[in-house]
Structure formats: C-alpha cells, structure tokens
Amino acid sequence: MMNSSLLTPSSSSSSHIQTPSTTFDHEDFLDQIFSSAPWPSVVDDAHPLPSDGFHGHDVDSRNQPIMMMPLNDGSSVHALYNGFSVAGSLPNFQIPQGSGGGLMNQQGQTQTQTQPQASASTATGGTVAAPPQSRTKIRARRGQATDPHSIAERLRRERIAERMKALQELVPNGNKTDKASMLDEIIDYVKFLQLQVKVLSMSRLGGAASVSSQISEAGGSHGNASSAMVGGSQTAGNSNDSVTMTEHQVAKLMEEDMGSAMQYLQGKGLCLMPISLATAISTATCHSRNPLIPGAVADVGGPSPPNLSGMTIQSTSTKMGSGNGKLNGNGVTERSSSIAVKEAVSVSKA
C-alpha cells in the first residue's frame, strides 16, 4: 500500500512527460527518477510525519515548530503528497476536515482566545504601567507673558505707574497725561516749594527786606544761568528767566504784606502755609520794625518809601504785561502773572 501511495504522484506527473521514443519503458523511467531523487526515509506508523503544508510549502524545522498531524486512517500519506497535484491536476481541491481542518480550527480558536486575554491584561494593568502624562503648558492671557523676566518687568512698570499717579495727585492743578509733561509739572512744583520754604524761613529770622535783597543779589550775580533760590540748579533759557521774575515778585510782595504774597502763590497753586498764618507773621514782623507799609502807600501826597510803592509794583507789572505773553516755567504766561500781581496789590491796599 505504501508503494501504491508513492507511485500515485509520480504516475500523475509522468502523464505529462512525453517519451522520446515508443520503445521507452515507463517502469524503468520511474525507477530511475526514484533512485536519483533524495526521498526521505520511510516512516512507520508509530511516529507521526511532519506535514509539508497545505499549499505546497516545506516546513523548516529549524525556524518553525513541527505541526503534528494525527494519523486516523490510511489516507494520511495520500494527504501528505496530495499537495503536488493541487495546482495542476486538482483545481477544485478542498482541505479534508478530518485531518487538517481540525488543526486549523484549533489554531484559530487559540488565537481568538489569546487576543481577549491580552486585551484584558492591558485593561487591568493599564493603570499601573500607564505612561506619565505630559505636563500641560500654562498659556498666558492676551497681553501677558509667562517668562519670569517679562513678569518682573511688567510688575516694575505697574509700580512706576502707581508712583507717578501718586505724584500727580500731590501736585495741584496737575492735569497732564504723558509722563514727560507730568514730570515737568512735578519738578516745577518742587522748585517753588523749595523757594517758598527758603523765603519763609528767612522771613522769620531776618525779615522780608533781607529776603528781597538776597534774592536780588542772587539774580544779579547768576543772571540767566542759574537761580540760587531753587537749590542752585542750572536751567537754560526762558524757564530760568521766569523763575527769577517770580522770585522777585514774591520778595517784593513779602516786603509789603506776606498775606498778599501767599495769595499770589495760592493763585499759582504753590501756597504751602495758610494765608492767615502768613498774615500774622508779616504783621508781627512789620510792627517790630516799622509802621505798616500800606498806610504809607495810602498817603498819596507824601513821598513814597524807598523800598516799595504801589506805583513801582504797577510799573513792574506793566513792563511784564507789555511782552508777547511768553510761557514761564509753570505754563502760565507772564501777562497773567502781571495781572495776578495787580490783584495782590489791590488786596493789600484794601
């Protein structure tokens, strides 16, 4: 039976070979082929044979595991060599369900069983072996940065803006919006405060006459270059001239009446002390030195005192008013300052 099974594929293949002559013996040709081909040793029924695959492919014993095929009946050898004639002589060949089909079904079942187990293991152990989540990047709001240097710079600008706002609240009549103009107002205000403190302190010590003389000497020595009553700081041009003129006006008004000088400074928004206190200081100082100057000014027929008279102040204000109305350091025209001087003189006369 083994010989018949071995001769089956050879007989089918020999049918396609054309003999060169009619006297050629088929049995001799088959014997020559079988003797030259390296056939495997005959395996008895006790040991299973490795299958060559259902599609004619050889099984590599070194790389793939040997597939065991049960030997239920005598058709196992026929099924083993049946792959030679699948592509040629048997186009409608079907895999037998008894021998090989069961093995394929078993393999499919094992594969489908291992897949749910793998998915279940990943589902149970996903929490333990899960990859670490990436840190979410904090996005800044529009117009703000997350860099530490940018944050520090923004905080510094906010502090500067708060300080500038506080300074602007301290300066009276300060309505500038840009920083440059705001700083100019603050500088002018500080200069006039220094002047007022200087004048008041010297008036308490030596009287208003000494203050006016020192202011005149300082203005004559330094000229247009600097002003000694503004801390000795040097400014250029019209700003220095206007500061010097204002100092002379305040000194002259303080010689007559300190209250009028305070009113003049209050009109400019530069009054530091109450007018009543300044009037009391001026009255006490004038009583200790001379009679009141307004009484001498009211005497029209008598000669005017050499220090100050109403006509002198009016002539000074007229000269200042005859200009073109240039701006001084506080942004007030010289014409308006002359009007303020006239008003101060009229108040002192009353």
Swiss-Prot record:
One of its GO terms (molecular function) is DNA-binding transcription factor activity. Residues 1-22, 97-152, 219-241, 318-350 are annotated as: Disordered. Its main location: nucleus. Disruption phenotype: No visible phenotype under normal growth conditions. The triple mutant lrl1, lrl2 and lrl3 exhibit very short root hairs. The double mutant drop1 and drop2 fail to develop sperm cells. It comes from the Eukaryota. The keyword Transcription applies. Residues 158-193 are annotated as: Helix-loop-helix motif. Residues 144-193 form the bHLH domain. It is found in: Nucleus. Residues 223-241, 329-339 have a biased composition (Polar residues). Keywords: DNA-binding, Nucleus, Transcription, Transcription regulation. Residues 144-157 are annotated as: Basic motif. Induction: By cold, UV, ethylene (ACC), flagellin, jasmonic acid (JA), and salicylic acid (SA) treatments. Residues 106-133 have a biased composition (Low complexity). GO terms for biological process: microgametogenesis; pollen sperm cell differentiation; regulation of DNA-templated transcription; root hair cell development; root hair cell differentiation; root hair elongation. One of its GO terms (cellular component) is nucleus. Transcription factor that regulates the development of root hairs. Transcription factor that regulates the development of sperm cells. Homodimer. This is Transcription factor LRL1. It comes from Arabidopsis thaliana.
